[in-house]
Amino acid sequence: GLSAAERQVVASCWKDIAGADXGAGVGKEXLIKFISAAPEMAAVF
C-alpha cells in the first residue's frame, strides 16, 4: 500500500492532470499511462 505522503503526492498529481484535461482527454490518457506504469497507484483512486 501507499503511505499517507505518497497518497498526497498522487492526489496532487491527479488534480494537476484533471485540471489540465479541460475535457480534451489529455488528462485521462496521462492518468492511464501513469497507472499503467505504476499499477499500485490505481488503488488510490
Swiss-Prot record:
Residues 1-45 form the Globin domain. InterPro entries: Globin (IPR000971), Globin-like_sf (IPR009050), Globin/Proto (IPR012292). Transmembrane segments: none annotated. Keywords: Heme, Iron, Metal-binding, Oxygen transport, Transport. The keyword RNA-binding does not apply. GO terms for molecular function: heme binding; metal ion binding; oxygen binding; oxygen carrier activity. Gene3D superfamilies: Globins. SUPFAM superfamilies: Globin-like. Belongs to the globin family. Monomer. The sequence of this fragment differs from the corresponding region of the major monomeric component at 9 of the 42 known positions. This is Globin, minor monomeric component.
